[in-house]
Amino acid sequence: MHFHFGWIPVCLALAGPVWGQQPLVGTSVLEEATGDVRSAALVADIDQFATQLIKDAEGKRSAFWKLDLSSAKSYEASVEPRRARLGAILGLHELDVRVPMVGLEYLSSSVHELRLAEAAKYVVHAVRWPALEGVNGEGIYLKQRAEAVACVILLPDAGQTPEELAGLVEGKEMLGQAAHELALAGCDVVIPALINRQSDFSGNAELGLRTDLSHREWIYRQTFELGRNVGGYELHKVLALVEWMQARKVPVGVAGYGEGGRLALLAAALDKRIDATLVSGAWEELEDTWQRPLERNGFGLIKEFGEAEIASLVMPRPLIIAHGQYPALPAGGESKAGVRKNAAPANLDHPEEEAVRKGIKRARQLVGDKLAEHLRLVIAEEGDLAIFPVEAVGWLRKALQVGKLEAPSELRIRRGSLPDDRARQQRLVNELVNHARHALQVCERQRTALVWKPLAAAKTDDVRMATTAKLRKAFWEDSIGRLPDPVGPPAAQSRVLAQNEDFVTHEVMMEVWPGVSAWGYLLVPTGIKEGERRPVVVCQHGLEGLPEDVVNEDSSAKAFGAYKGFAATLARKGYVTFAPHNFYRGKDHFRVIQRKLNLVGLSLFSVIIGQHQQTLAWLKTQPFVDGEKIAFYGLSYGGKSAMRIPAVLPDYCLSICSGDFNEWVRKCATVDLPLSYVYSGEYEIWEWNLGNTFNYAEMAALIAPRPFMVERGHDDGVGLDEWVAYEYAKVFRYYNKLGLGGKSQIEYFNGPHTINGKGTVEFLRQHLGR
């Protein structure tokens, strides 16, 4: 370890019987290892823990499913709550009301003719339709010259255009086989444009910022915090079409390939008005979603749903799964000048036939033999390059009760008038950016209704504490995700690292859950008398940090610039301090854990809170610790910890947030300031629907009436003073109205992203009594 504590060798015993030199109560000997080794092992252990949670999810799903298989009607009624739950997970937000859909708008101009192409039986138009206020669908419409016998929504992969699936693009006519066949069979066919995987519009031209984020990830980063997602928006567009088609009193089908296949399956699961569904190049079990493009993240998705469960929601309507061609992600390009490379890693796999058959078998077992008759698997013949196998399209036509095909006819294309896909993509992306902007502006109303109104209505301390406890439970379980309480009692290991005339430093590890440990440094002042109990300050490092960073007093060390060795400084003032390791370290190593945990309705802080639960329980067993006076003080990601951990763990008697307090939701979701996380590489940062539930002021309300302080440097680039002041004003007003104005403070200082250690030290002295 390369840091400096002003230590003297452990063998130089100091005079007098002081607690710091005696073995820590109830601990066994901890083997020696470096901080880097301990951290890497802890991250690896938690990764295995998260992987096991994913493996265990399937076996626990039945608790959410109460199926009535006595009849098709009874079955559909029994799964109705699951439809609503799936829609919420996918981002069909209850505040987003679809605009009434009365028809398709034809797009034409002096440049682009009304008819893009025509055949003997149908004509082709560019169209637009409303989905939400300010959010439209656009695509290609193959319209029958006579009355249509059915309507089909044909969804491309995100790497394809509607024109390609309509067979209008020279050299790619084969992609139009399914659309042409359905149109020849008498179907009206609408092919929507999806948000694609290019990055042309992933940035803010007014700020001069461009990123390499796919348009899909670009929208995800703005909307996940607001309870929405790009797939949810696209489902709104599809379901708006379903509403219009269903009113025409003909069968309605949905078919899709790749990303479009995924949307087709989800749409059919959500809307019983879809009569038949074809899913091609999209079936895979959802346990691997953490490896897929970031926008597929769903908080709690696989806790309640696998691919089989989603398919079961389509029954008893026909569902055809085609296994053949699967799309691939485009290869990453070279770095471009002026373009930030901050996209999350991702891949798309081609699942093995055996895995697909296994998933289909499980879906059939879920619904029973009678309903399973409506689920069909089509394996494409070897060498079949069609994205929609001919056999699968045939089964879709049969399910829609479509008659024989007409004889093929020439499709005459007016190539000069095809829509500009790039301009259309810009419109679609900008619409969602603007919708997210509006949602960001109004989400404060939802937080007010959820948190501040109930607290204001609480007229007694008992009612207010009960209200706070209810909100705390919701925050922990629904926003962070709650794991079972740690195993107990805590069994710890420790070793003395070093000592000086003011304190002894112990390294401590303890089991939290099987395979998951908590680890940190305990600094015990040397002046503690037998029987004396001292207050504790838990000193939390930030991103990519180690416990040694907050105890290192060497002013030449890199970490000293931010932390100033504040855990050691406080120990010299007589506080017991503990520097725990939070596992946000290792770049993609810990970020992948976040992706895994999100799938089962958990987050990094689900694990971190468990580690702190166990640490608090262990600290209280030490005879020199005042268990009623354990405070929290964290910088940067440690400041994030200061907002979340004490908010759900009342055993922390106060909290100090340094270098992180913010208009947090805005920092996560806005595209209008360079400091936003949408422009950073920290792709783990977004927390599902937090914008409508708990911003930092609301988290602070969960800490109240315990003391709470903010430490803010004017030059700290994590936020703006104006944002910080706006958010903190709500906190101070709440404390002040409770008659607790002295229990909440903010200190501004001239400085950057660092511990200042002046007003905060006085705050600790005032409330901890030293």
Where are the model-predicted features located?
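Loop/turn elements at helix/coil->beta-strand transitions in domains of secreted/extracellular proteins
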Residues: 149-150, 185-188, 250-251, 272-276, ...
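Alpha/beta-hydrolase-fold catalytic nucleophile elbow
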Residues: 156, 193, 255, 280-281, ...
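Alpha-helix capping and helix-loop boundary segments enriched in small/acidic/polar residues
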Residues: 165-173, 209-214, 221, 225-236, ...
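Cap/lid segment of the alpha/beta-hydrolase catalytic domain
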Residues: 148-246, 251, 283-295, 529-621, ...
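Alpha/beta-hydrolase-fold serine-hydrolase catalytic core, especially in secreted/extracellular enzymes
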Residues: 21-137, 144-147, 224-233, 239, ...
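Flexible loop/turn segments at secondary-structure boundaries
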Residues: 135, 159-163, 197-201, 211, ...
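Primarily recognizes the serine-hydrolase "nucleophile elbow" in alpha/beta-hydrolase
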Residues: 240-313, 617-690
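Bacterial N-terminal signal peptides
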Residues: 6-17
